[in-house]
Every structure is written in structure tokens, then in C-alpha cells.
Amino acid sequence: VEKQTSSSSSKDTSSTKKNTSSQETKRIGNADYGYIDIPSKWIKFTDIDGTEAVQYTDGSGYNIVTLNSFTREKAKVPADIEFNAEFLAKKLAVMWQDNQDVGKMTGARTKVSGLDAYQLQIVMKSGQYLITWIFQKGEKVYTISFEGDAETLKTFIPYIEDTWSLDGTGAVTD
């Protein structure tokens, strides 16, 4: 999925929001990772690697959204190295570049709720997409990842880029 890095018009933004709001949604996340709206039918998912991140799936176990965040301490970054979204994006790219299952990896710049974000776009040899948005608010770096098929990804991008915030009003606890 190629992401345009040019700024979109307000008309584009309102039509994107209209598309996501026409589907019934629920708010998921927590105070540490932030919150996003997702389709109501999506369910909580627990990864076998035991990650602390918040994860939801459409029920397939293939299409999954993951919310996480990192402080300098959690990312194990020494005090003499600048810790920010760019650092974490580069660290993730290096981690993935030697993975033999990766077919293609590219990067882009985008926005998440008005915040500058790095986007790591990976297409696995299997055809599965793994897209991660990396952005910073204050001292914390947030990541939102989507893994799954191209069609679901296309519909999911507005949920990530338009609805993320630290406001958990109405969030579900399932």
C-alpha cells in the first residue's frame, strides 16, 4: 500500500471520516497506548508471544491491530542516545530488514491525528501486509500496527490516522 505524503485537502479528510463513521465502531485501547475506533465486530486478541500490547482482530486471527507505546526505559535506549519516533522507526526497520519472510519494505511520512508519523510498510512473501505507524507525543513514542490483507488494511487506515487520541471516553474493556 503506497501512502501519499502530500497533505490532503479537508474535503478528503471529511470523506474519509464519513466512511469510518458510517460503520458501527467501538473505542479500544488504554491510557498507556492511546485509543482508536475500530469496527464493533472486532474482538480482543492475545498474541502467543505474550506481548503487553492491546490487540484486536476481525475474528480471523489474520487481520490484527496492535497498540503499544515506548518510553526510553521500555525501549532500553541509553541516556546518551536521543529517543524519539525517528529512532524507534529506524530500530524497527533494522529489526525487519534481515527477516527472510519479508518481500518488500518501504517507509513513508504521514500523520496520526495531526501528529507527524513515520510509517513502516512491509509486505511479507506470503502477501500479508504489516504496516506500523510510529509517532511521538511528549516523552513517549506510540506505535500502531496493522497486519493482514490489503483490502482490510485499506478500510482500516482512517481508523488509525483519524481516531487515535489519549481520550478514552467510551472505551470498551472487553
Where are these regions (language model features)?
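A general boundary/transition motif marking the beginning of the first structured unit of a protein
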Residues: 30, 79-84, 148, 152
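Extracytoplasmic/secreted envelope proteins and their assembly/folding machinery
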Residues: 36-39, 85-93, 132, 154-161
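Surface-exposed amphipathic alpha-helical segments
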Residues: 42, 141-174
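Conserved polar/disulfide-associated segments of primarily extracytoplasmic proteins
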Residues: 48-142
